[in-house]
Amino acid sequence: MKNKSWPSQKFEGFWMWVIGLALLAGCWGADIAVAATAREIDVSVDVALENFEKDVAGSKPFLAGAKGLLVFPKVIKAGVGFGGEYGEGALRIGGKTVDYYNTMAASFGLQFGAQAKTIVIVFLNEDALKGFRNSDGWKVGVDGSVAVITIGAGTSLDSSKLNEPIVGFVLDQKGLMYNLTLEGAKFSKMKK
């Protein structure tokens, strides 16, 4: 039997990873393969905001004072060694949806499996919101930063203590998640 050369082995290994990711996406992320309608996104955003207000003390007045909210009700992250995440959401201003967006990010490192999370991005000033809306694909860490907020048990969200123009919250089925970053996530406008 003839040994394969290094480039050939490397090429086969790459395709094994690609096939593995495709199978993983097919098993766990079948529901993300079909883009949601505008109505489906709006209903999911409503539910996500209701859950956010229930899970995070003081969030209702905080959200009411925001200049804009970018909500991704379900962002799926899947990977085998390297992976990615995808979700669809809506930008709301004054309680009304004005645009639809998707989010994508790639990740590398030790990982296997899939998980779902909700992302709520809050624009606290007009300039930050305007800069976001005028961009053609806005990437966290490149086009601007998002301060991911964590709140300890027994404390309430207080906007007077937040000095950042854009803040973000990441939640899973159990509530607010800790030690997460949105660095590298890209938000792009969709036509709906």
Give names to the regions the model predicted.
Residues 1-12:
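N-terminal secretory signal peptides that target proteins for export/translocation
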Residues 2-3, 21, 32:
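Helix-centric, low-specificity signal for extended rod-like, repetitive segments
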Residues 10, 25-28, 33:
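Compositionally biased non-globular segments, especially hydrophobic aliphatic-rich helices
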Residues 15-28:
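Bacterial N-terminal signal peptides
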Residues 34-192:
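Small-residue-enriched, tightly packed secondary-structure blocks
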